[in-house]
């Protein structure tokens, strides 16, 4: 699977990314929205860096986030994308 077409979300408060299959007959599988512009994150590691002004680099907040969201959701879910690209 490949993440393509990063953009601002439809509500303009989130990130939006498309999940595509691999191969010659690649097709879009789904669109995922994650994050929120009104809340801070540890560090914005997305290709767009739209909300990098909200970076806190606060390890205490990062630990608190992981304590609030302990479950590991499947790869390419909104939770997985948030943990990989924002926290």
Q: Residue ranges of each PLM-predicted region?
A:
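Arg/Lys-rich, low-complexity, intrinsically disordered basic segments
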Residues: 1-87
């Amino acid at each position: 699977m490949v993440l393509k077409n990063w953009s601002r979300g439809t509500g303009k408060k989130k990130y939006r990314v498309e999940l595509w299959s691999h191969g010659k007959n690649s097709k879009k599988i789904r669109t995922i929205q994650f994050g929120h512009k009104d809340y801070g994150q540890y560090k914005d590691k997305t290709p767009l860096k739209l909300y990098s002004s909200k970076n806190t680099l606060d390890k205490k907040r990062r630990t608190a986030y992981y304590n609030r969201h302990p479950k590991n959701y499947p790869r390419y879910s909104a939770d997985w994308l948030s943990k990989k690209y924002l926290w």
